[in-house]
């Protein structure tokens, strides 16, 4: 795992602040106090130690109890409410002791009631009529580019009259390209790994922790498994090591037959995408068709200073990190453009449906505008579908969980037994997506739709923890 830190140095140093010294300062201060003063006191008996321990526990209880008593677990003022949704902020506000309490409560197996709830819900879904196929079996390849931290707001944005993403901008204007600019990211603690979960299995991330870390070897329904029935081979390309985010295990659980890691070929993280695209093409050219290829990029991981030659080098912004983000986004866009050109040159472009989407938000739009509050609309990531055999309107809000059922439809695998917890963009668009905090984006005002989409988070958490789909395979 240490090897995966290569190239992260600038990012790590950029994240460190003086206030972070408080993490180690109490321990150092206590050791200094102990060495200087505690040895001067005479030895105590066990009763004194027990009294000190009891007093410490009572003091901790008096400090921590009000947050639990005065607030509901769903509120951010309650430790569990904040740890569930914004774990870093929760660490700062409530500390490690509250996190241990939270872990004891939530990192557990499923109760009988939870299992019954999930099983009943899934049985209801199975009783629905089979969906009608939207297209005939076309045997086109599927190439999915999962772009690290790519968001919608830089696309078609001019800064000092200059385009940040000329390649992606041009795609938004092509008639055979579907472009959704309002895709609400629904990742949680697993971030990029959660995005792979959403797109490949149609499930939402677990409530606590990262699915890839805690439940990597569970049984999952998936896009690769659905396509395998139709004769597809599934391949995943990673810039980093397969151990990062436990991707060796999840790749296998999701049904990918081949995995190529270290596609950065020794380049630093911020320059990884160029080699990912360069070295994946020869492999795809030799691969038996039809195939499903997932390419997971890395360059956009952090907004750091680079040596890229950019038209924004002299750009003056109050937040320099936003400038760095624009420069890296410009580079990533250029890499994607070159990859598409290569596919066209080699004859793979016309034989493939190409999907480009961001894995999660990072540099949200409010930071570019200098606003402190981050709205859900500031977090949107894009979705491009090139050579789409199906057409649909693209102006509504969708969630990342809606991509999986949409890909099943577009690839003619709509007969697969699990169609995910979202809705296909080719069948129904409710203009609603629910964030992991329970907030909803979009213009939908129907309580029943919003309530159902919120319920999907609870259902998915239970399905994953109870390993529900293992029983489906065994049957």
Q: Which residues are covered by each model-predicted region?
A:
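Solvent-exposed soluble domains appended to multi-pass membrane proteins
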Residues: 120-475
